[in-house]
Amino acid sequence: MMPEIKFIIAGDFSQLLPVKDRIEDCNYKDSMALHELCDGNRLQLTKCRRSDATLYNMLLPENINNIKRKDFKNKMTDRHIAFTNKKRIEINKIMMDQTIRNKKIKALELKALDYDPNSQDVRLCTGMPVIARKNSKQLHIFNNETYTIKEIRRKEDEITVEDGGRREHTVPIPEFTKIFNVAYCITVHKSQGATFDEAYTIHEFNQYDERLKYVALSRATDINLINII
């Protein structure tokens, strides 16, 4: 035992519950384990530092179920959130094709993983967003972190991606689809923890429960960035 260790645990209990949790209807917020780890201390923040007050108040528990699609814009942007992997794959294909067409370049084409139904055929070029599917200690890649393709070197058979801190990571082309998904569109679950300071579009909104709505909408720093189609 090391009683001198102090835990600082931060989180949002309104976000999505653990996937395939082994315990049903667990009250994590008021659990004895969390109480013990934090020495009985809990600070409840009352001011949102991520978004504007309008969006914050809209997402309060007493208001969130009154939200309607018409409360937001309905544009197709360059960034997307979807509920299902089927829709995610569909939107990513649309965006990849559009990007390649607009840039008028020859894309690097890679096939989907035959063992993973959530993988997809990709057409890659520089500037495309990708998200890590898993950790890679060797390559210093972290699961669910987003990256941008900086360079594709076909002769060397490798791709360099850049993270948010502008650190570069080089990945062998044959390993790329094992490590990354294209990330024009990501699922609501994958978006947890992200902050969007650019316009984005939410898909399949009619399938969202209260927690899914909360996560998808609270990514924005400004209510005017949100589009629902």
Regions found by a protein language model. Give the residues of each.
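Conserved ATP-binding/catalytic motifs of P-loop helicase motor domains
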Residues: M1-I229
